[in-house]
Swiss-Prot record:
Lineage, highest ranks first: Eukaryota, Viridiplantae, Streptophyta, Embryophyta, Tracheophyta
UniProt superkingdom: Eukaryota
Location (main, coarse): membrane
GO molecular function annotation: monoatomic cation transmembrane transporter activity; potassium ion transmembrane transporter activity
Positions of transmembrane segments: 33-53, 96-116, 165-185, 237-257, 297-317, 353-373, 401-421, 476-496
Catalytic activity: K(+)(in) = K(+)(out); Mg(2+)(in) = Mg(2+)(out); Ca(2+)(in) = Ca(2+)(out)
Name recorded for this polypeptide: Cation transporter HKT2;4
Membrane topology value: Multi-pass membrane protein
Membership in a protein family: Belongs to the TrkH potassium transport family. HKT (TC 2.A.38.3) subfamily.
Cytoplasmic side: 1-32, 117-164, 258-296, 374-400, 497-509
Keywords: Cell membrane, Ion transport, Membrane, Transmembrane, Transmembrane helix, Transport
Compartment list: Cell membrane
Amino acid sequence: MPIRLHIFVSSARHAINSSALICRFIAFHLSPLLIHLSYFLIIDVLGFVALVVLRPSNHKYNPRYIDMFFLSTSAVTVTGLATTQMEDLSSSQIAVLTLLMFLGSEMFLSFLGLVLESSKQNKHDPENRRVSSVTVCEQSHLEEAIPQTPSMNSTDIKRSCHKYLVFVVLAYMIIILVTGSLLVFMYIAHVSSARDVLTRKSINKALFSISVTVSSFTNGGLLPTNESMAVFSSNNGLLLLLIGQILAGSTLLPMFLRLVIWALRGLRLAKAEEPDFMMNNSSSVGFSHLLPNLQTIFLAAVEVAFVGMTVILFCCLNWDSAVFAGLTSLQKITNALFMAVSARQAGENSIDCSLVAPAALVLFMVMMYTPSLTKLFSACQDHKQIGPESDDRTSKGKPFLKTMAFSPLAFNTTVIMLVCITERRSISTDPLNFSTFNIIFEVISAYGNIGLSTGYSCSRQLQHQDGIACHEKPYSFSGWWSEPGKLILVLAMLYGRLNSKDSTSARTR
C-alpha cells in the first residue's frame, strides 16, 4: 500500500509539474487574444460536459444540449442569460455554474495575470538565481563593505509589488466572497420573508448564499431562482447587500483596492516600500484595476452621480406603473438603485424588465453597450504608458485575428441581422414578443455580458396556435429562439467577453 501511494503521489506531482510547464509555455509564447480564447473555450467545454453529465433535480425535465452549452457559455462569459428554468437544475449543476462564473470573472483572470507576470519576472531575472562573478578583496575592504546595504532599485520594487499585489488580490477575493456569503446567509436565516421563498422553492440556503454572492461579485448574473432577484424585491436589506458586492467587483474595485493597500500599510503587514510605491506610482505597476489616486476619486464620484441620475430617471418613469406594484416608497427606491447598479454590470433584475418604460429600457441598453469608466481609464493610462511610437509598431505587427476582427458596432449589426433571419417566422407570427427592439436589447445584453432580458409573455401573443398551449417560462427571451439563433448569441457572448478582456489586458501582460 505505501508503494502504491508513493507511485500515485509521484505521478500526481509529475502531472502537476508538466501542466505548469505547459501553462508557462502557452502564457509566454502565445498572444493574449489566443490565450483568452483558448481559456474560455476550454472552460466552456468542460462546464458543458459537467452540466450534461449531472442530472437536473426535476426528473421530468430533459434539457437539450444546445441549452446546456448556452448556459455554460453564459456562465463562463459572466453574461447571465438563461434558456432554461434555473430551479429545474440540481444543486450540483448550480455549483458548476457558480464555479464557471468565478473562473470566467474579470477579477480571477486579473489575478491569474498577476501570477503569470510574477512568474515571468522571476524567470527572466538571473540575478536572483546565480552569482555572476566573485571578487577577492582584502580584509579591510571587506569590513568596510559589511555595514553598507544597497537600496532597492525600481525593477526590484516593481517585482516586489507584483508579488505583493498577488497576495492583496487573493485576500480581497477571499474576504469579499466569504464575508458576503455569511452576511447573505445570516440575512436569510433571520428574515422570514426571504427564508420562506427559498423554502417554497426547495433551494438550499447555504448554496443560494454562496451562489448569489459569487454571481454578484463576479457580475455573473445567474441565480438559483427562476425570477432572479424579483422574488426578493421587498427585501431591502438583501438588495443592499448585493449592491455592495456588485460594486466591489466592478466599478468601485479600484477604490476598494486602494483602501485595502492603505489599510495594510497602516497595519504594517508588509514593508513600507511596496504599498508606498503602489499608492504613488500605480500606473507603473501595470495592473489595470489599480488606478492613480485622482482617477480613482473621479471614478467613484462619477459612478455615484451616474447611479443617482439613473435612479431618479427610473423612478420618474415607472413610479406608478406595474413595475413597482405592491411596493412601498422605500422599496421602490431600493429596487431602482439595485437596477441602476445591476444594469451596468451584473444583470440581476429585481423587477420585470418587460414592464419597464421604453425610455428606461433604452437607457439600460446604452449602459450595457458602453464600457465602464474603469476600462476607459485603464485604456487611457495604457496609451500614455505605451506612447505613439509603440502604437505604430503594434499596429504594424497586429495578429491576423485582431486585424480581421469586426468593430463592436459592425459585429452587433451583423448579429442582429442574422438573428432576424433565423427568427423570421416567429417575427411574422408573434411580432409583439419578437419585436426588433426586444431582439436588439437581447443581443446588446449578450455582447455587453450583462444578462438583462425583456423575457417572453404569452399575453402578448396575437396568434394562438391550435392545439398548442402557451406556458409562461421565467427565463431569458433568447430561450424562445431557435437553435441557430441561440448559437449566434453564444458567439456574441464570447466576442463581447474577448473584446472586453482584450481591451484591458495590455497592462497585465
